[in-house]
Amino acid sequence: VRKGMTKPLKLNPPQLLALMFLFLVVVGGVLLKLPIATEKDISWLDAFFLSTSAATVTGLAPIDPGSTFTLFGEIVLMVLIQVGGLGIMTFAVLVVIVLGKKIGMKQRMLMQEALNQPSLGGVIRLARNLLLFSLLMELVGATLLAIDWVPKMGWAKGLYYSLFHTIASFNNAGFALWPDNLSRFVGDPIVNMTVSLLVIIGGLGFTVVFDVLYQRRWRKLSLHTKLMLVMTLIVNVLAIVAIFLFEHNNPKTLGSLSLSEQLWASYFQGITPRTAGFNTIDIGSLDQPTAMFMIFLMFVGAGSTSTGGGIKLTTFAVIVFAVVSFLKGKEETVIWQRTIRHTIILRALAIASMSMLFIFVVTLALTLTEDASVLALLFEVVSAFGTVGLSMNLTPHLSMIGKVLIICVMLFGKLGPLTLVYSIAKPKKTNIRYPNGDILTG
């Protein structure tokens, strides 16, 4: 072997996960482009757009999936949603366990990164429990939807549609097989409750769900779990009330519905914008205040280690508490008698700042390439970033450049700003300490 030959490329866990995810998107795009997958031919760009949308559990679609894809194509979408939602490494661990092989240290480190865990201890057991819990929830959800849909559609279609929409709901992907999404079920209690509860559970994050299942008492729950549960309740209630107040006089959305349908629609649309892009009213007809409020919800997003996107609800909560502490003149940020480390606050600020800058730059770029209002463009970008999937009817009309930009935003939103930064840069620790310097701010 000659000296000076290049060393084999060593990838850290974030880089490996990013590459594995891109590989999933490419394979999905190729499968969706196959003649067996479509009723009518679609472009390569649309195939990769939909593959990215499914793998990132977003739900934005330039074409109607229900009328475009064959059963094979829809199953490919379903698999992409499931693998993308629960994580590639989680499924890789399942395969290794089934084959009866040992899981090495490198695989455990990948699992630790994928599941966002502070240590290696118990990550394999956690992955197995995550899979079992997910499959159980999807079985329950599919059964509930089947009770409503089988009598209306027949056994085969009813069961299949129940399974597809349950997987999409639990993984917080707003894909539906009807051109109007779920608008035809605006007043249906079973559909509204089943889909919304699956979305909430999927959006809480498995660490919260398992903490609640194992501890069962409020006192024993971790600070993260308590914060997620309280913030989820507050944000959901505020969203439901706000949407009802903003839209109840709009004849194109809630105004034309009965009072019970208005209440169901407000409830459903209040819960889904943070994580899953299902809709029972026409999003393109929303009044401007509602659209702006939904942009905020989509930006905040779901919980850490969940199937949803956004900057994450706890990130937003930490920033709010830190700002309040600063305004009160306190040097430390305290949440329920627990001091939050400065590194966590800086991490939250970094995530929010990078995300806002990225959204601004992409929205600015889209104003140059697309013929649409700034509000519709911002809505589309934040929906892609939050891996939500709601659109003001803009996705089918995007230009080629516009679609490529939205694909990039969906990937950025799914992988997360810090994961991408760690993939590119190698964080270095230094023992050098410099004297303090003062800078005027504000």
Model-flagged regions — what are they?
Residues 1-442:
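Membrane-proximal intracellular helices of multi-pass ion channels
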